[in-house]
């Protein structure tokens, strides 16, 4: 197995230009494909997950081309040319879930599959929602999980659609992105969320981008959404992809731990991403934070001992970036408790279990629950002989790069898994640390 040994690191300072947001990139690609007209997408993330979406769209007959760093997508006007296709979705939840909903409305024959871990990630609540409007979707493996077979069906909407919100916000996102194409006698479509909606900021991203493509959705609290029926998606002509706020978290945390200043560019206070609020959490831990519309800068604490301090935080608003806090907690005085993170269980790996296991290898005392993690720093630090496992999870690898600020070197196993969202992460990280 390939591995990378880092540290011990003693400083962090510099400026990082962030790659595009994964969440925004794949949403924009699908919306551009469904729209009428040509869309020029600037600063699209170049990663495994976006390549999966691009390949799927090409297989479905959607034309796109690359011009320099831009991607130009020729929209299909809501009707994919190819009505039969087998699509391999890798481990890209931001691709398979919205595409499942879009394809259910296409009147075609489609099969969607992925890597083994994808076949363990739930999709049943989305399928249940689509079946309510007449979609015909069969499971080809275990009930409630991919792979899927979507068959031609007559879609009818004559009642509110109910979807669970407490497992993944991507189910709701998928319905919001595709159901406006459907017809309804009333001219409107209602979606009711069952249970507490998690990861609300990701729904804000979806609503914001839909508006850019001409689809205005009425949100009534977080329990009900009213969509236009029979709507036409219109290309905005050109759209910029923000820098990835989740990826920003590793560099901002490095600034807090390693003294800084570390500045990230491409995301700031004008961002539509919830993970931008990660900087607020660092500030609560004692770091110095400055920000503008398109940048954030972090320096270490001004305490005499230079240490951050532990906090208790409801992480529903920063579900991905909260992972970074779990590793930053190694460098804080006292215990850090992260709550409302149940969605970690159904990500690229069971992130609560994986994070707890690897933090303990470094000597931390960790308590894990169904939806929380409690971390007390190591006394003393330990170096695991077998290195830090990354579980084929890009965020595990990037998070644990921060452990290199400890007093001992740290070995990251399978560092190449960062290709899912940030292929050159470790070289960029090396450029601002030492």
UniProtKB/Swiss-Prot annotation:
A GO BP entry: chorismate biosynthetic process
Keyword Transferase: yes
CDD domains in alphabetical order: EPSP_synthase
Subcellular localization, as worded in the UniProt entry: Cytoplasm
An annotated GO cellular component: cytoplasm
Principal location class: cytoplasm
Reactions this protein catalyses: 3-phosphoshikimate + phosphoenolpyruvate = 5-O-(1-carboxyvinyl)-3-phosphoshikimate + phosphate
Binding site for phosphoenolpyruvate: 22, 93, 121, 170, 351, 395, 420
Protein EC: 2.5.1.19
Active site feature: 320
Assembly description: Monomer.
Family affiliation: Belongs to the EPSP synthase family.
NCBIfam families in the record: aroA
General function of this protein: Catalyzes the transfer of the enolpyruvyl moiety of phosphoenolpyruvate (PEP) to the 5-hydroxyl of shikimate-3-phosphate (S3P) to produce enolpyruvyl shikimate-3-phosphate and inorganic phosphate.
PANTHER family: AROM/DEHYDROQUINATE SYNTHASE, PENTAFUNCTIONAL AROM POLYPEPTIDE
Protein name stated in the entry: 3-phosphoshikimate 1-carboxyvinyltransferase
Organism field: Cupriavidus necator (strain ATCC 17699 / DSM 428 / KCTC 22496 / NCIMB 10442 / H16 / Stanier 337) (Ralstonia eutropha)
Record gene name: aroA
């Amino acid at each position: 197995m390939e591995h990378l040994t880092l540290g011990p690191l003693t400083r962090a300072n510099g400026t990082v230009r962030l790659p595009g947001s994964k969440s925004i990139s794949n949403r924009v690609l699908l919306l551009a494909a469904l729209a009428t007209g040509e869309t020029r997408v600037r600063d699209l993330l170049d990663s495994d997950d976006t390549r999966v979406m691009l390949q799927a769209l090409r297989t479905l007959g959607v034309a796109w081309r690359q011009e320099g760093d831009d991607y130009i997508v020729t929209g299909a006007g809501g009707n994919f040319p190819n009505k039969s296709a087998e699509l391999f979705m890798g481990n890209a939840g931001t691709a398979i879930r919205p595409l499942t909903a879009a394809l259910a409305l296409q009147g075609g024959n489609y099969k969607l599959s992925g890597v083994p871990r994808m076949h363990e990630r739930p999709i049943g609540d989305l399928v249940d929602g689509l079946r309510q409007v007449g979609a015909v979707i069969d499971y080809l493996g275990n009930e409630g999980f991919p792979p899927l077979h979507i068959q031609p069906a007559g879609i009818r909407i004559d009642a509110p659609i109910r979807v669970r919100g407490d497992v993944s916000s991507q189910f709701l996102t998928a319905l919001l992105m595709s159901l406006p194409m459907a017809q309804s006698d009333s001219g409107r479509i209602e979606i009711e969320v069952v249970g507490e909606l998690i990861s609300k900021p990701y729904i804000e991203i979806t609503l914001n981008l839909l508006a850019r493509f001409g689809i205005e959705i009425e949100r009534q609290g977080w329990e009900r959404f009213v969509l236009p029926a029979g709507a036409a998606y219109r290309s905005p002509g050109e759209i910029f992809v923000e820098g990835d706020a989740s990826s920003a978290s590793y560099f901002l945390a490095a600034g807090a731990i390693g003294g800084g200043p570390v500045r990230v560019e491409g995301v700031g206070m004008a961002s539509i991403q919830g993970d931008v609020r990660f900087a607020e959490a660092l500030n609560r831990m004692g770091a110095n934070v400055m920000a503008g519309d398109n940048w954030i800068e972090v320096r270490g604490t001004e305490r005499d001992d230079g240490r951050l301090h532990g906090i208790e935080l409801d992480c529903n608003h920063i579900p991905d970036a909260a992972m970074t806090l779990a590793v930053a907690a190694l460098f804080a005085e006292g215990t850090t408790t992260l709550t409302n993170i149940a969605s970690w269980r159904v990500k690229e790996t069971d992130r609560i279990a994986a994070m707890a296991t690897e933090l303990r290898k470094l000597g931390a005392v960790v308590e894990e629950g169904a939806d929380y993690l409690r971390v007390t720093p190591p006394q003393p630090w330990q170096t695991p002989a077998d290195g830090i496992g990354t579980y084929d999870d890009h965020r595990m690898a990037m998070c644990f790069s921060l452990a290199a600020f400890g007093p001992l070197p740290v070995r990251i196993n399978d560092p190449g898994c960062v290709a899912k969202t940030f292929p050159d992460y470790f070289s960029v990280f090396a450029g601002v640390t030492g």
